[in-house]
């Protein structure tokens, strides 16, 4: 009997085919991130995005990403500048938190 390892998923839902994976949804396209999460059988990881009165954006990643391949879902829909800055701040936070790779899924 042949086992298809491409669909193998560990019990902790963050390891797919031996790779530690995290999926994050930012504010612009949560619905798409939920569809990806369901199709890939990966939970969306927790992130807290705060916008201060002066326009500054703060991102707090609530899960450890050290050594993980990270995917971020964020589009450039209006307001494009705010969504792009949110993505850049998130990418910086992930890099500083030692994510192995960062891949952005950015639909137009």
Q: Residue ranges of each PLM-predicted region?
A:
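PRPP-associated nucleotide enzymes
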Residues: 1-108
């Amino acid at each position: 009997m042949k086992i298809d390892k491409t669909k193998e998923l560990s019990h902790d839902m963050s390891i797919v085919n031996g790779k530690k994976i995290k999926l994050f949804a930012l504010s612009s396209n949560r619905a798409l991130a939920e569809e990806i999460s369901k199709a890939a059988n990966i939970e969306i990881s927790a992130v807290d995005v705060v916008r201060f009165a002066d326009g500054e954006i703060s991102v707090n990643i609530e899960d450890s990403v050290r050594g993980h391949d990270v995917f971020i879902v964020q589009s450039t829909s209006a307001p494009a500048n705010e969504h792009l800055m949110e993505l850049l701040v998130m990418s910086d936070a992930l890099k500083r938190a030692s994510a192995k790779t960062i891949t952005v899924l950015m639909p137009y």
